[in-house]
């Protein structure tokens, strides 16, 4: 009997202890949350910056927007309401002032630079950092090795390759139009992405992906194209510490498998290009030779070739689609572009990379299209140096996340007159837009980490658009009137851009 009484006593004690422990843990958690909210609102070093209270208390609303793909419109709304700098999370500020752009991303003295958010920029599948994710001296070293592939000399030598795939695009579209009796619309984003993938495949690996010939996504390209969202979700999950490992377990294994397969296929293509020893002006021919006698190691080459394909294809195709959409929605601008292009050339053969550089309205149209629809609309997060920094005349403590919100800056009335109106004239000296702060439009960023292939991208877009407007009359279908109403996960989640094409009669 005494034994049973003892067991019951310990059992009650154990249950009471567990209950007391749960109550204590609950109280401590509640106390911590209340204290954290109080601290973030009233005591945090960023307490003086404008922004809604619900964003200053927790990072969860910010991450919810990231996961749902609604970060871009929400940031635009915040800046419209609160001004050029907004506190978007307890320890993060968003800017739309171009002075902040220069401070955050521009050239700075050693030790004073703004580091990339380590949670957002992870190494490639093989664990090696690319030009996108490397820091400091390592980044400078990688950039020096890649830069010759994007020099003016290289660009001049690559123009025949660019011309070839532009010719192929126009020929395939012409064949499709001639074969279609009912002027069936085509998805121009698909045709643009097939073109840029074929081009970048040829430049990166010495062989195209043959998307244009097949008029479809090949298996490899489909994997790469779908990998963007995978990369976005994996990177976002890493910002949820200490729950990041749990969240990553919830990401379907198929998404990670696609990422791994893309990398392994890239490795095979790099190996095949190196083994061929071909003498042609593609990216690898310059990178393999090295810079100042220092060549890129093979693991580094694998990591960077994957990035070159991802960044070099999607961004240009997005830009082309966005510009096409804006142009077809604005008939007067379309008319001016068509008149400039069709009056500048007597034959289609005259439309080459060098000749399109001399068309001012075409250049303005591209600049305005990229302002309205930047391929990567979200900000690029950075960490302030340990000693802190002055941004737009205000002190920001060290270890603070800061970013220049690209799309919000491009659409801000503080930076542009009629910011939501597509007006190429703003880039041509029209006095109506004299107060525009044009340096606020930076679709390819600035500074030592700006897009290394921006000159190639601009040339591609000008050439392809000139050829399209020379060859076809184009009309947007009614269902695509709101095509630019899109979510984004690093890049835009694009819908089909359905356009009716008809051959120009000459």
UniProtKB/Swiss-Prot annotation:
Keywords: Heme, Iron, Membrane, Metal-binding, Monooxygenase, Oxidoreductase, Transmembrane, Transmembrane helix. Its EC number is 1.-.-.-. Heme binds at residue 451. It catalyses: 4-O-demethylbarbatate + reduced [NADPH--hemoprotein reductase] + O2 = proatranorin II + oxidized [NADPH--hemoprotein reductase] + H2O + H(+); proatranorin II + reduced [NADPH--hemoprotein reductase] + O2 = proatranorin III + oxidized [NADPH--hemoprotein reductase] + 2 H2O + H(+); proatranorin I + reduced [NADPH--hemoprotein reductase] + O2 = proatranorin IV + oxidized [NADPH--hemoprotein reductase] + H2O + H(+); proatranorin IV + reduced [NADPH--hemoprotein reductase] + O2 = atranorin + oxidized [NADPH--hemoprotein reductase] + 2 H2O + H(+). Its main location: membrane. It is found in: Membrane. Its cofactor is heme. It is a single-pass membrane protein. One of its GO terms (cellular component) is membrane. The chain crosses the membrane at residues 18-38. GO terms for molecular function: heme binding; iron ion binding; monooxygenase activity; oxidoreductase activity, acting on paired donors, with incorporation or reduction of molecular oxygen. One of its GO terms (biological process) is terpenoid biosynthetic process. The keyword Iron applies. Pathway: Secondary metabolite biosynthesis; terpenoid biosynthesis. It comes from the Eukaryota. Cytochrome P450 monooxygenase; part of the gene cluster that mediates the biosynthesis of atranorin, a depside of polyketide origin that accumulates in the cortical or medullary layers of lichen thalli. Atr2 is also able to oxidize the atr3 product proatranorin I to produce the final compound atranorin. Belongs to the cytochrome P450 family. This is Cytochrome P450 monooxygenase atr2. It comes from Stereocaulon alpinum.
